[in-house]
Amino acid sequence: MILDTSLLLAILQREPGWEQHQQTLERAEVLRMSAGTLQELLLVAHCRGVLEPMQTLLELIDPDVVPVDGDLAERALGIFKRFGKGQGHPAQLNFGDCFAAALAERDQLPLGYIGDDFTKAGF
C-alpha cells in the first residue's frame, strides 16, 4: 500500500473510522511512501502540533520511503497537470497527493487515503 498524508493524519488524530484504517495498515503486506509525501506529512504534522506523535507513528509502521527520482517527479507532474489544484479538475490534488498517486501508479500498489480527492481522479 502507498501511504498518503490523509490516511496517517486520520489515524493519528483518531478521526471517524480511524480504527478501520489502522487495521488496513496492519494487514498491508507492503507499506511505502514517496519522500515527497513524507515531506508534506511532516510539514502538516508540525503545523498541527503533532510532529512528535507522527514521527512515533512512522517509526512504528516503518514504511519504505522511496526517494524522488526523475521518473517519479515527471509522473507526479503529469498527475498534477491532470488533477492538481488550480488545474480545473474537481480532484484538486496537492503536492503530496501527486507524489502518492505517482508512486501508486508506478508501483501498481493500492493507495491508502482518506477523502474523495483521489476518487475524483480515478484512483
Where in the sequence are the language-model features?
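Short, well-structured N-terminal submotif of metal-dependent ribonuclease cores
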Residues: 1-33, 43-59
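A generic structural signal for short hydrophobic patches within well-formed alpha-helices
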Residues: 8-9, 38, 73, 118-119
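A generic hydrophobic-segment detector
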Residues: 105-123
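A general structural signal for well-ordered alpha-helical segments in protein cores
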Residues: 18, 38, 51, 73-77
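Short active-site oxyanion
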Residues: 27-31, 62-64, 105, 109
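Histidine- and aromatic-rich ligand-binding microenvironments
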Residues: 3-4, 33-34, 93-94, 115
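Generic detector of contiguous secondary-structure segments
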Residues: 53-71
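Active-site neighborhoods of divalent-metal-dependent phosphate/nucleic-acid chemistry enzymes
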Residues: 66-110
